[in-house]
Regions:
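Boundary-proximal intrinsically disordered activation/regulatory segments immediately upstream
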Residues: 1-71, 157-158
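Short acidic-hydrophobic, aromatic-tinged amphipathic segments that line or gate anion-handling sites
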Residues: 4-9, 81-86, 176-186
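Glycine- and other small-residue-rich loops at beta-strand/loop junctions that grip anionic moieties
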Residues: 7, 37, 128-129, 154-155, ...
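Short, aromatic/basic amphipathic alpha-helical patches
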Residues: 67-79, 236
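Structured adenosyl-cofactor binding patch, chiefly the S-adenosyl-L-methionine
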Residues: 102-104, 142-146, 157-173, 234-275
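RNA substrate-binding interface of SAM-dependent RNA methyltransferases
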Residues: 109-206
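Active-site/ligand-binding-proximal alpha/beta "capping" segment
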Residues: 199-252
Length: 275
């Protein structure tokens, strides 16, 4: 039987993780062993559990305890705290309307190294300073659907485990292997050392079309996407093996990074190419 705790006061310290700590505070870089994240909705929480994430506590609508949450709770220790209230009370507490009426505080998993997640990969995505959590989530969803084996991110970009990012990804951030690129060495050199060629998605005249057969024939290819607005840094483009552009019409010169990723992943991912 789950440890159901009806909410009687907003000031209970155990609710800080849901109501008063920012996501940056939850990351807790000074104490990574105790770092946390918040997963939202039964689907996302279920995929986090599938990925081996450890649940710490729940916050949910009272009606979901024996409804949508029942299967999720059956997978968790019986003594895990489950804080409950009606939806309007939860909205007052958190400041937003819960998707499917459920949040779960979970322990952040330890990240693997670039070499560990890329050794057997053939198609990976590199995200340079992509800042919007919604874009991060959409990119992960496309990566999962369209045959990308891993995602690498620069440290300045948005965290894939932010609540909005994991929700928009439909939980695929727990299915697609990912990690951060090292800041003390050239990540291009790291990827070249692992056998990857790099393809920068950039708005330049001296580019290959996305359908160029040389890209599809590469046994190991990293698709490199840049930040919203400015795109990739010039130095990044110059150090990549290819520069690639999506052909467009009607005078449109660019796509949102999440939309561009879907097009690129479809064309170059393992789903489309027998590489």
């Amino acid at each position: 039987m789950a440890n159901i705790i009806p909410i009687t006061s907003f000031s209970v310290p155990e609710l800080d993780v849901f109501a008063r700590l920012t996501e940056n505070q939850l990351v807790n870089r000074a104490d990574p062993a105790n770092a946390m994240f918040i997963a939202e909705s039964p689907l996302v929480i279920g995929r986090a559990l599938d990925g081996g994430c450890v649940p710490l506590s729940f916050l949910m609508e009272t009606k979901h305890v024996e409804g949508k949450a029942a299967e999720i709770l059956s997978r968790c220790p019986e003594d895990i705290p489950v804080y409950t209230a009606e939806l309007d009370v939860l909205t007052q507490l958190t400041g937003f309307k819960l998707t499917r009426g459920m949040l779960c505080a979970m322990r952040r998993p330890a990240l693997k190294s670039v070499a560990e997640i890329c050794t057997n990969a053939r198609r990976i995505a590199v995200l340079e300073n992509v800042m919007n959590p919604t874009n991060i989530g959409a990119i992960f969803r496309s990566a999962a659907a369209l045959g990308m084996d891993a995602v690498l991110l620069t440290a300045a970009g948005s965290d894939p485990l932010y609540r909005r990012a994991s929700r928009v990804s439909m939980g695929t951030v727990f299915q697609v292997p990912w990690t951060y690129l090292p800041e003390d060495v050239s990540w291009q050199d790291t990827l070249h050392g692992l056998g990857f060629k790099t393809a920068a998605m950039a708005l330049r005249d001296d580019t290959l079309p996305l359908s160029d057969p040389r890209l599809e024939k590469e046994p190991k290819l990293a698709v490199v996407l840049g930040t919203e607005g400015d795109g990739l840094a010039n130095t990044t483009i110059e150090h990549c093996d290819y520069t690639v552009k999506i052909p467009m019409s009607h005078g449109v010169d660019s796509l949102n990074v999440a939309a561009a990723s879907a097009v690129a992943f479809y064309q170059l991912g393992t789903l489309h190419n027998n590489v």
